[in-house]
């Protein structure tokens, strides 16, 4: 039986329980997969703009600093050599991208594993809404009465400005919209609080994870692939336009 979550109102009163979707909140966590996805996410945070100058890029003369023999020093042909003061850096960092390609199925499986860990520990909760007007005091009251941890992840819809303005200044509370929910934020938070609307969007109408860039627009769909009939019609149209131009 999949875990359940307590549903609260903005006053902190329990108004019911909700059976969580099994394959999202009661899966088999793969620790290696979660680690791989989190490392890829942290690597994507890096800008990769680091840069040092090589001996070909540093400023300096090409003149030989001293004669080849007779000084007792090791021979040297340039003041831009790595061992010289002000010389170039050998094998230094150069601008690069740290992005790891991570398939969507892996990202989805890792997120389900993280949510499963929190759900089995009773740390996934749902609130009806944050009210009609933003109120930091009401949000603090909700967190205190329900005993939510100071490390809290709030998941709301992108259009829910009331939730955003109610919790944005509370220390230790991070708010993300449904399209931003990820494994790293779930792991770094002790409790996860969904608004009811965000939970419905997250699981989708069929009880499946609506994993897309815009989960708040379920009507968005990909263009339909052309059929052989469409290709034939397009060929006929091009042929007709060609005949009109040539006067045939």
Swiss-Prot record:
GO molecular function annotations of the record: rRNA binding; structural constituent of ribosome
Entry keyword set: Ribonucleoprotein, Ribosomal protein, RNA-binding, rRNA-binding
Region (Disordered): 48-95, 210-248
Cellular component terms per the entry's GO annotation: ribonucleoprotein complex; ribosome
Alphabetized InterPro entries for the sequence: Ribosomal_uL4, Ribosomal_uL4-like, Ribosomal_uL4_dom_sf
Pfam families, alphabetized: Ribosomal_L4
GO biological process: translation
Keyword Ribonucleoprotein belongs to the record: yes
Start-end of Basic and acidic residues biased regions: 233-248
Assembly and interaction partners: Part of the 50S ribosomal subunit.
Matches recorded under NCBIfam families: rplD_bact
Record-stated family: Belongs to the universal ribosomal protein uL4 family.
Primary role: One of the primary rRNA binding proteins, this protein initially binds near the 5'-end of the 23S rRNA. It is important during the early stages of 50S assembly. It makes multiple contacts with different domains of the 23S rRNA in the assembled 50S subunit and ribosome.
Name of the protein in question: Large ribosomal subunit protein uL4
Species in which this protein is naturally found: Tropheryma whipplei (strain TW08/27)
